[in-house]
Regions:
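Conserved beta-strand/loop scaffold segments within soluble protein domains that form the structured core
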Residues: 1-2, 6-174
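A short, hydrophobic C-terminal helix/tail in secreted or cell-surface proteins
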Residues: 178-182
Length: 182
């Protein structure tokens, strides 16, 4: 089964904060597509939190677009708990006028033959700031799983700040045996 969810965060009448939490559960053989368009106005902050658990053959396809003038703080946590689960995350942004975009994306591979693909592309101008922390964690038991993270950023000016912190974690087994000495 498949489901598509669309969120639009539009400018409010006054400055302030908006906090949104989206929790998803992709059951066996299901696919969830989450599309989020973030268009906050100047002086408006968006705190966005997405969490998803994917069972066997479960998938999350995430598309996030950041436009507008407000600051965005984005947290994404996905657990690929069963075999053949997957995450495809695509993030696009146009940041300007000292706008801030702070992303912390974590995907944990538990099942076998799981897959994660993370693509973040955008443009920074007018003293805008972006920090992207992307972590792909291969937990013990996630044999034959794969993950990829790519990013393309267009920097329009010497006053922009672009920080990217990619992390890949991989559980390691250490074997010791007297038989190895034979």
């Amino acid at each position: 089964s498949e489901m598509c969810i669309r969120d639009r965060f539009e400018p409010a009448q006054a400055a302030g904060q908006l906090a949104v939490r989206t929790e998803l559960y992709a059951k066996k053989d299901s696919r969830i597509r989450l599309v989020q368009v973030m268009m906050r106005g100047e002086g408006q902050e968006l705190l966005n939190d997405v969490g998803c658990i994917c069972e066997e053959n479960g998938a999350l396809d995430l598309l996030q677009v950041v436009v507008g003038k407000g600051d965005v703080y984005d947290g994404i946590w996905t657990e690929l708990q069963k075999d053949h689960a997957s995450l495809q995350a695509e993030i696009g942004y146009l940041l300007q006028n000292q706008q801030k975009f702070d992303v912390n994306l974590n995907v944990r591979h538990f099942g076998k033959v799981t897959e994660s693909t993370i693509q973040a592309d955008g443009t920074l101008m007018d003293a805008a700031e972006k920090i992207f922390r992307g972590t792909i964690d291969f937990v013990r038991g996630s044999a034959d799983s794969v993950g990829a993270e790519t990013e393309q950023v267009l920097l329009l000016g010497d006053d922009v700040v672009n920080k990217t912190i990619p992390v890949i974690l991989c559980a390691c087994l250490l074997y010791t045996s007297d038989a190895a000495d034979d």
